[in-house]
Amino acid sequence: SDVIIATRTSNIGMGGPAMVEGGGLGVFKPEQIGPAAVQHGNGVIDILVDDEAQAVAAARQYLSYFQGPVADFTAPPAAALRDVVPENRLRVYDTRQAMEGIADVGTLQHLRTGFGQGIHTALARIGGRPVGLMANNPAHLGGAIDTDAADKAARFLQLCNAHGLPLVS
């Protein structure tokens, strides 16, 4: 699948309690197998939401990026980026704020936020056109790319390529 959207109370596992017990791994309750918090942290869940209504809204937003450009959009305020990126390149800043400063208002959808903290990835619209946004996170390992961040970036690049979305990095 392209994306996995889950609620915080959901579980994702390869087998249930009987399979785990049959494999000699102990006795577990169904809710102990593959909790969303664990799966989000290891990169399995792309978008984690509070409830099913938010999941439906997230799915609709996600699918909207593959419908092409829209004529009705609101660009972010021109001053939105003015204070986000510091003049001193050695200072840490929040790349998610920079993404918000270039994306059309209300169109930013971050992916895999619990995994690969060295890279921030998101789908958005700029001038009504759907795009992928990707940025190194200078607050994590000084912006260095570790294995989780590389995995996250590679998967995001595949997603953008598969759907013909331009990448802004």
Spans of features found by a protein language model:
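Conserved catalytic cores of soluble enzyme domains
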Residues: 1-71, 165
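Extended, hydrophobic alpha-helical segments in both membrane/secreted and soluble proteins
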Residues: 1-5, 12, 146-160, 165-169
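Intrinsically disordered, low-complexity segments enriched in small/flexible residues
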Residues: 49-131, 135, 139-157, 161
